[in-house]
Structure formats: C-alpha cells, structure tokens
C-alpha cells in the first residue's frame, strides 16, 4: 500500500518523515521557481510598455549574458539597433543614454529567463540523483524544463518579428509568448500545491471540473490581454461602461475577412477582451453558487468567495487602466493582478482535488 502511494505522488521516501521532508523541499523549490517566473513576466511587461523589447537585436543564449562593458561596446550595440525599423521610423535621434535605458529592460528580462532555467535544471538534477524524485514527478519536471526551452525560442521568434519590417513585435507572437509563460506558471504552481497537506476532503468531481475550466478561462483572458498589449488596443475606446456611447460599437468588423478583426483590429480586440472579462466574472460567480450549494461552509466554498473578489478587483483595475489610457503603473498592476487571479484559481483547482497521495 505504501509503495502504491509513493508511486502515485511520484516522490520516493524511506518512512513518513523522510517522505514529508522530500515533499517539503520539492515544494519550496517549486515556489522559488514560481516567484522567479512571476518576476520574468512582470519585467517582460515593463519591457513591452517602455518600448524596450527590440533593443537587443541578436539572440546569444550564452554570450548574451554579458552586457556592453565600455563605451565602444555600447556604441556597437546601439548601431545594431539603429538598423531596425523601430529606430528609423519611431526613435530616430535617440541618444545613447536613452538607448541604454531600454537596453537594460530587455537585458534584465533575458537574464531572468536564463536564471530560471538554471534554477530548474540544477535542483532537478540534485533531487533526481539523491532519490527525492520518482516516477511521474521526474518526467513532469523534465517536461517543464523542455517547455521553458521552447518558451525561450518563442521569445526570440517574437522579437524577430519586429526586426525587419514591423516597428513592434507581432501581436500574435506576443500573445503566444505571454500565454506560454502563464501555462508554465500554472503547471509549476499546480504541482507545488499538490504537495501540501489539506485538512479537508477533495470536492466532488463536478466542482473539480468547473474549477479547472475557470483556470482555462483565465488563461484565455490572458491571451486576449496579450493581443490588446500587442496592438496597443488599450488606447482605443477609453470609456466605460458604454463603448464610445454604444453597447456594441459599429466599427468592430471593418476588415475582411471578418475573423481578422478578432486578432488585428485594435477596437475589436479590446471589445472581446472586455466581454470575456465579464464572462470570467460570471463563471466565478456561478462556480461559487455551485460550491456553496453542494459543499456549504467548507474551505472549498470559502475559497470561491475569495476568487470572485479577486476577479472583481482585477476587473476594476482593468477599467481604471482603460479610463486612464493605460499608464505604465496601472498597466503593470493589471498584469500583476492577472497573475494573482491565475495563481489563486490554480491553487483552488488543485485543492478541490486534494494532495497527491502520501
């Protein structure tokens, strides 16, 4: 029976105390990875909002760790930036000091991305070799490591879209890059929360499924937010609750074929992001009603109230960001709170299932 339980959780231990200690170590490691991933996404958001994402025009996974160290190297790096359309059409005349400002944002974003790879790979090797990981958990972590490598490639694929013709990166690639980061965050936190001890029994299967769908809905909304960011769609329709005096504006489908508007028309993209925000809030409320009806007074039920509150707060931040035409501080706050909502939704989903078997 004990061997079966150990296989289910994917952790190897000699006795309960060793098993508990191993679970705790792995969980803390995953929390550290989670925190750095949040930092990467936030620095990435600042990089985007300050127009810094194209300041480094080459992808050097190893050598790129070292920034320019003297004036000549800075001039050389600046000259590379001066060859791309963003400089020639938007930032022409930028000083070296101004270039250094945007360079450091992109460099920090890339450095953190490299660091998280190290933070995953080295402890993973240690836990693996010392027998603290077994079975499914090993391969889940290898999958996360591979997904992280893919995310790095997606990041460069995104940057490359803005180096030849466009003056900014493709909104398609930006949204994919952001969403993939959030999928990784979801997976890391989900596994970590499966290693805690819960005092309450798992919820019924229908509640678990609904909780999972809410996580999916939040990820979809984050993808839509990536499209909004890539198209600077937050600078259109800066009114609420009506949209320039209408419930449904008349200029949502001005491009042909019609479906292109959903991805390329800033006004349509913002409209869809708005409407889906209401959908996420409605789903959270319906889920709370479901859980309070089927498991009243439980921790599961109380968590749904917190979830509704977080989604509501995020909606209010989004409205404020919209009304103020997306200033840097509010844009970053909106992005950070999206991650808060995602993390809590993931924690709730995992808790409805209970911990992995000991």
Curated annotation (Swiss-Prot):
Membrane-spanning segments: 25-45, 111-131, 141-161, 176-196, 210-230, 269-289, 304-324, 326-346
EC numbers: 1.17.99.9
Pfam families, per database record: COX15-CtaA
Catalytic EC class: oxidoreductase
GO cellular component, as recorded: plasma membrane
Gene: ctaA
GO biological process: heme A biosynthetic process
InterPro entries: COX15/CtaA_fam, HemeA_Synthase_type2
Membrane topology: Multi-pass membrane protein
Subunit (UniProt): Interacts with CtaB.
Function: Catalyzes the conversion of heme O to heme A by two successive hydroxylations of the methyl group at C8. The first hydroxylation forms heme I, the second hydroxylation results in an unstable dihydroxymethyl group, which spontaneously dehydrates, resulting in the formyl group of heme A.
Name of the protein this chain belongs to: Heme A synthase
Organism: Brucella suis (strain ATCC 23445 / NCTC 10510)
Sorted UniProt keywords: Cell membrane, Heme biosynthesis, Iron, Membrane, Metal-binding, Oxidoreductase, Transmembrane, Transmembrane helix
Subcellular location, record wording: Cell membrane
Cofactor: heme b
